[in-house]
UniProtKB/Swiss-Prot annotation:
Protein's GO biological process: DNA-templated DNA replication; error-prone translesion synthesis; SOS response
Organism: Legionella pneumophila subsp. pneumophila (strain Philadelphia 1 / ATCC 33152 / DSM 7513)
Residue ranges constituting the UmuC domain according to the UniProt record: 7-188
Lineage of source species: Bacteria, Pseudomonadati, Pseudomonadota, Gammaproteobacteria, Legionellales
Protein's recorded name: DNA polymerase IV
An example molecular function term from Gene Ontology annotations: DNA-directed DNA polymerase activity
Length: 355
């Protein structure tokens, strides 16, 4: 019988913005954001909690963020500094386990099931990691401790910033009952809307549906929903995980009727993709650009082109070519990059959003 797993999700609080406030103390308690220049149609990579009170969020166009908060202080992205801090944190984590799965520069999963540190207590390990990060770098982290990755990630967000939460194995069944379905991995606004149409608001509501029904209604996502609603997630912490692509997509409440409508939503997708690339930090270089279209008959097509950088003109061309394959209304549109699978890493030059 396999032992009950002890999974920790470490998530740095407003990582880029926190570094800026640490390095420039005069910014403390002021609304700040890290991101691109509004004059160059940049996007927000992250912001501090003071800025979030104004409704500012990651991937938001900088110009819009400045409209929400005229006092917003905009800081340029200092990726080399953020990467250095991330490397220190990663080296600290390796003192507790070799089973570390980084998700980005500012968050990672740890499997400490076999760790003997802190008397084998995952709770104490998380507390010690957070304390050591703050002592050495004056940066706060939040942590979630649970029997699996999904619950650990949910828990790390529960007492942000600078807090942690434990979900014990014996408490999982009770914990998930009142959990809003929007907290589940893979449930975005569109999926939440579909679930609400079925009067599904919590995991308890979701548990009333059979796996057969959920598979019929949502395809492979139905199986995921069935398991997550019961606190089940058997995914291992994968230290060998290699990011192969970065992408964003959107399912639209009303189908996009033609290629012009698809091109009209491209700026929003591009802004979100840029923010996701910035969050990923150094990547192995771009190999391909691609677009994905799912038509209103649920048929899907993907078209890609070899490119070593983001190119808005090429993405426009790919959307037009992809749409021409069927010429039908589009219900889902996605764009992304495929990465070079090499050991050398580089920063990506992001283009201007100029359509």
């Amino acid at each position: 019988m396999n032992p009950i797993r002890k999974i920790i999700h470490i998530d740095m609080d407003c990582f880029y913005a926190a570094i800026e406030m640490r390095d420039f103390p005069e910014l403390a308690n002021k609304p700040i954001a890290v991101g691109g220049d509004a004059k160059r149609r940049g996007v927000i990579a992250t912001c501090n909690y003071a800025a979030r009170q104004f409704g500012i969020r990651s991937a938001m166009p900088t110009a819009h963020a400045l409209k929400l908060c005229r006092e917003l202080i905009l800081r340029p992205v200092r990726m080399d500094v953020y990467q250095k801090e991330s490397q220190y944190i990663r080296s600290l984590l390796t003192e507790y386990t070799d089973l570390i799965e980084p998700l980005s520069l500012d968050e990672a999963y740890l499997d400490v099931t076999e760790s003997t540190q802190c008397q084998g207590s995952a709770t104490w390990i998380a507390e010690e990691i957070r304390a050591r990060i703050y002592q050495a770098r004056q940066l706060t982290a939040s942590a979630g401790i649970a029997p699996n990755k999904s619950l650990a990630k949910i828990a790390s967000d529960w007492h942000k910033p600078n807090g942690q939460m434990v979900i014990r194995p014996e408490d999982v069944s009770a914990f998930v009952l009142d959990l809003p379905v929007r907290k589940l991995f893979g449930v975005g606004p569109k999926m939440e809307e579909k679930l609400r149409a079925l009067n599904i608001k919590t995991c308890a509501d979701l548990q009333r549906y059979s796996i057969e029904y959920l598979l019929q209604k949502f395809g492979t996502m139905g199986q995921r929903l069935y398991e997550l609603a019961r606190g089940i997630d058997n995914r291992p912490v994968n230290p060998e995980r290699i990011r192969k692509s970065i992408s964003v997509e959107e399912t639209y409440p009303k189908d996009l009727p033609n290629s012009e409508a698809c091109l009209a939503v491209l700026p929003d997708l591009m802004a979100r993709l840029e923010a996701r690339i910035q969050r990923a930090g150094k990547i192995s270089g771009i190999h391909n650009l691609f677009v994905k279209l799912k038509f209103n008959d649920f048929q899907q097509t993907t078209i890609e082109r070899v490119m070593d950088k983001l190119d808005l003109i090429v993405l426009r061309q790919l959307i037009q070519e992809g749409f021409a394959r069927r010429g039908m209304p589009v219900r889902l549109l996605g764009i992304g990059i495929k990465l070079k699978q090499e050991n050398t890493y580089q920063s990506v030059q992001l283009p201007l959003l100029d359509l």
